[in-house]
A protein has these predicted regions:
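Conserved beta-hairpin
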Residues: 67-82
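Conserved acetyl-CoA-binding loop-helix of GNAT-fold acetyltransferases
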Residues: 103-117, 139-144
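A short, internal acetyl-CoA/4′-phosphopantetheine-binding micro-motif in the GNAT/acyltransferase core
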Residues: 72, 91-106, 131-132
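A short helix-loop-beta-strand connector motif used in the catalytic cores of GNAT acetyltransferases and
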Residues: 58-70
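Conserved beta-strand-loop-alpha-helix junction that forms the acyl-donor binding cleft
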Residues: 128-139
């Protein structure tokens, strides 16, 4: 379910070779991502691989709460899914499922573009409910985009970014 009163775009361009594609109910290709026990540990805090039922329930939940997208990378002239992200004011779960794309700054690019989307929609603040204390890469990605640690949670930390504050003067000065 998209954000109430907002039409979810079919695609959002992130860079020349990265885009977000609106969830369309097809996710079989993502099954292999959630077989990676290290990835599952970073996402869920345990190492139990997903079965198709669990994957279906996860995507149904995310789609019901925000704008669910697959992160796609252009490879040999065609886009292919490499991860997923869900955007809403209360959380921004993101996964780079294809391990060959991890550590390349793609998560940071996606987070930055969704911060921009939040501003476009007039949101004053975005939140991340919890990043596990041991998921240092995710903490760094969100912090590098301007998110601030908000509170300690049961297993890590929550984060937020105030979208009403802008770094530096973004407008031309008035010479009057």
């Amino acid at each position: 379910m998209p954000i109430p009163g907002v039409i979810q775009p079919k695609t959002i361009e992130v860079s020349n070779d990265i885009r977000l594609r609106k969830y369309d109910g097809n996710y079989d290709f993502a099954f292999s991502w959630y077989q990676d026990t290290e990835l599952v540990y970073l996402v869920d805090g345990d190492r139990s691989p997903y079965d198709m039922d669990r994957l279906s329930r996860m995507y149904s939940y995310l789609d019901a709460h925000g704008e669910l997208y697959f992160i796609e990378a252009k490879e040999d002239g065609a886009y292919r899914p490499i991860g997923d992200v869900t955007f809403w004011q209360d959380d921004m779960p993101i996964v780079i499922g294809d391990s060959k794309y991890r550590g390349r700054g793609i998560g940071r690019l996606v987070i930055s573009r969704l911060i921009e989307r939040g501003r476009e929609l007039g949101f004053g603040r975005l939140n991340v409910r919890e990043i596990y204390s041991y998921n240092i890469a995710s903490q760094r990605a969100f912090e590098s985009c301007g998110f601030v640690r908000d509170a300690e949670t049961e297993n890590g930390f929550s984060y937020y970014i105030d979208l009403t504050e802008r770094k530096g003067n973004m407008h031309a000065s008035d010479n009057s």
